[in-house]
Swiss-Prot record:
NCBIfam families: rpl4p_arch. Part of the 50S ribosomal subunit. It comes from Methanopyrus kandleri (strain AV19 / DSM 6324 / JCM 9639 / NBRC 100938). One of the primary rRNA binding proteins, this protein initially binds near the 5'-end of the 23S rRNA. It is important during the early stages of 50S assembly. It makes multiple contacts with different domains of the 23S rRNA in the assembled 50S subunit and ribosome. Belongs to the universal ribosomal protein uL4 family. InterPro entries: Ribosomal_uL4 (IPR002136), Ribosomal_uL4_dom_sf (IPR023574), Ribosomal_uL4_euk/arc_CS (IPR013000), Ribosomal_uL4_euk/arch (IPR045240), Ribosomall_uL4-arc (IPR019970). Disulfide bonds: none annotated. GO terms for biological process: translation. GO terms for cellular component: ribonucleoprotein complex; ribosome. The keyword RNA-binding applies. One of its GO terms (molecular function) is structural constituent of ribosome. Pfam families: Ribosomal_L4 (PF00573). This is Large ribosomal subunit protein uL4. Keywords: Ribonucleoprotein, Ribosomal protein, RNA-binding, rRNA-binding.
Length: 260
């Protein structure tokens, strides 16, 4: 399977033989398993205060008083006297079955499964039906996957990267990501995650020589070195088919890393 190689002006200058994994079937089940495992392994343990609800001297009255035998606040002639405390059904009591920091959230994925998931996610980037299903705008994209000369990795100015996106038909997808940014629903908006930001173009290079600096300010654009490429880069949210740009050098690294 061959793909055209474009220069920074969007002109076809060469062809490259794509690695065999671009022709593999897309296994959504493996991709989802790998992405969810990666997300679970980043979770930070959390739990309640072990003493929560126990900071009281309340004691049960025992049997024979015609009331429930729950711990009750001591004292007389004040509003809290005799009020239930400590138990889960009482105001200010402990939480029933509270989360504990000892819980292990990690998930393990077999080595061959994880490798197959990455190969499958790469294959989805070459299939227009998966890229469109993710919501990417590819009307002006000449070919999938997009392969661009190695000079791409040295672009360190936002203006240069913007002109490159326009020349190869990727700018429409960047604008889609910019216009679809929205305020997050729920409490996350006040926890440093105010906006939900769509993903747009992923750039995969063999070595960063400035492209991260040039691309970082464009909405939804990510840059990753081929040696560190993961399933989550290619399938955010476990949805395969991200609009991806490869350099020939990156393809060589991936073939060496994932080849048969």
């Amino acid at each position: 399977m061959e793909a055209p190689v474009f220069n920074l002006e969007g002109e076809e200058v060469d062809t490259v033989e794509l690695p065999s994994f671009f022709e593999e079937p897309v296994r959504k089940d493996l991709i989802r398993r790998a992405v969810l495992a990666a997300q679970a392994n980043r979770r930070q343990p959390y739990g309640t205060d072990p003493r929560a609800g126990f900071r009281t001297s309340a004691e049960s009255w025992g049997a024979g008083h015609g009331v429930a035998m729950v711990p009750r606040v001591k004292g007389r002639r004040h509003p809290a006297a005799g009020r239930a405390a400590r138990v889960a059904q009482a105001v200010g009591g402990q939480k029933a079955h509270a989360p504990t920091p000892e819980k292990d959230w990690t998930q393990r994925v077999n080595r061959k499964e994880r490798r197959a998931a990455l190969r499958s996610a790469l294959a989805a980037t070459a299939k227009p039906e998966f890229v469109k299903e993710r919501g990417h705008v590819i009307d002006d994209v000449p070919h999938l996957p997009v392969v661009v000369v190695d000079e791409l990795k040295s672009l360190n100015k936002a203006r240069e990267v913007r002109e490159f996106f326009k020349s190869v038909g990727l700018w429409a997808d960047v604008e889609r990501a910019k216009s679809n940014r929205r305020i997050r629903a729920g409490k996350g908006k006040r926890r440093g995650r105010r906006y939900v930001k769509p993903k747009s173009v992923l750039i995969v290079v063999d070595e960063d020589e400035g492209i991260k600096l040039g691309a970082r300010n464009h909405p939804g654009v990510d840059v990753v070195e081929a040696m560190h490429l993961g399933v989550e880069h290619l399938a955010p949210g476990a949805h395969p088919g991200r609009l991806t740009v490869f350099t020939p050098g990156a393809l060589e690294v991936l073939e060496e890393r994932l080849g048969e």
